[in-house]
UniProtKB/Swiss-Prot annotation:
It holds the Pfam family AcetDehyd-dimer. GO terms for molecular function: acetaldehyde dehydrogenase (acetylating) activity; NAD binding. InterPro entries: Acetaldehyde_dehydrogenase (IPR003361), Acetylaldehyde_DH_C (IPR015426), NAD(P)-bd_dom_sf (IPR036291), Semialdehyde_DH_NAD-bd (IPR000534). It is an enzyme of class 1 (oxidoreductase). The lineage of its organism: Bacteria, Bacillati, Actinomycetota, Actinomycetes, Mycobacteriales. The active site is at 121 (acyl-thioester intermediate). This is Acetaldehyde dehydrogenase. NAD(+) binds at residues 6-9, 152-160, 271. GO terms for biological process: catabolic process. Keywords: Aromatic hydrocarbons catabolism, NAD, Oxidoreductase. NCBIfam families: ac_ald_DH_ac, PRK08300.1. Its EC number is 1.2.1.10. It catalyses: acetaldehyde + NAD(+) + CoA = acetyl-CoA + NADH + H(+). It comes from Mycobacterium avium (strain 104).
Length: 298
């Protein structure tokens, strides 16, 4: 398989893929001949190029799977080329050419999709919790607040805050299962940098089974921890009775934090780590499914 993009996210992703029992990174594709990511990939034994996607597509042997961490406009241009070449794509950009995937919630539904999108870091961290609640009770409204270290937010994130909030809000509804969703991102300027912290508010019926909701949240947290070990609850889910402050709804509030594995990105950049870890998880499940359908074993 190939990694398209040679920046920080692609480099962190490379280290995760090299540990995988199911995925074998062979190529890294960039556009900057001086890229540190390409240099690292070469030292680790990958074939590299600074000539872009067209170079990859011109190779006599092509990858089965591409992970792309470039930009939305680059991926929108490349996606039809991948599909024409029979290459599956996992998209870590905001392009959203294919369906958005949150592993605990809807990965199984999209294992045969030619192109899947990893939505946003805030989505990967918070939508699993909304999903955990909505599979137990109806959630008329959910709101997530994602706080990330300012130094971990690159120019792309800063230029696309509105896109982040809209995309994540939509995912809270369509994947998380809330009737209505809202997302807020906070760039925390603290120094030393703070790890990613998220707050998830879900409106629930007054007579909801609180024990069942709490258990569902714990189950989903364990599922996320299977691929993001630094994902954890800060405390037990908090339940509040209906009040004027909550619009007359009962609430469950969940606090999580995400510490990165420190493969290449620093541990405080859990917002980026959860994207590369989730993408690796999706790639592994696609590989397992492909082998299963083909009748093979690994």
């Amino acid at each position: 398989m190939a990694i398209v993009g040679s920046g920080n996210i692609s480099t962190d992703l490379l280290y995760k893929l090299l540990r995988s029992d199911w995925l074998e990174p062979r190529w890294m594709v960039g556009i900057d001949p001086q890229s540190e990511g390409l240099a690292r990939a070469r030292k680790l034994g990958l074939e590299t190029t600074h000539e872009g996607v067209d170079w990859l597509l011109a190779q006599p042997e092509k990858p089965d799977l591409v992970f792309e961490a470039t930009s939305a406009y680059v991926h929108r241009d490349a996606a039809p080329k991948y599909e024409a070449a029979g290459i599956r794509a996992i998209d870590l950009t905001p392009a959203a050419v294919g369906p958005a995937v949150i592993p605990p919630a809807n990965l199984r539904q999209h294992l045969d999709a030619p192109n899947v999108n990893m939505i946003t870091c805030g989505g990967q961290a918070t939508i699993p919790i909304v999903y955990a609640v909505s599979r137990v009770v109806e959630v008329p409204y959910a709101e997530i607040v994602a706080s990330v270290a300012s130094v971990s937010a690159g120019p792309g994130t800063r230029a696309n805050i509105d896109e982040f909030t809209k995309t994540t809000s939509r995912g809270v509804e369509t994947i998380g299962g809330a009737k209505r969703g809202k997302a807020i991102i906070i760039l925390n300027p603290a120094d030393p940098p703070m790890i990613m912290r998220d707050t998830i508010f879900c409106a629930i019926p007054e007579d909801a089974d609180r024990d069942a909701i709490a258990q569902s949240i714990h189950d989903v947290v364990k599922e996320v921890q299977s691929y993001v070990p630094g994902y954890r609850l800060l405390n037990e889910p908090q339940f509040d009775d209906p009040s004027l402050n909550s619009g007359g709804q009962a609430l469950v509030t969940t606090f999580v934090e995400v510490e990165g594995a420190g493969d290449y990105l620093p541990p405080y950049a859990g917002n980026l780590d959860i994207m590369t870890a989730a993408a690796t998880k999706v790639g592994e499940e696609i590989a397992k499914e492909t082998l299963s359908v083909a009748g093979g074993t690994r």
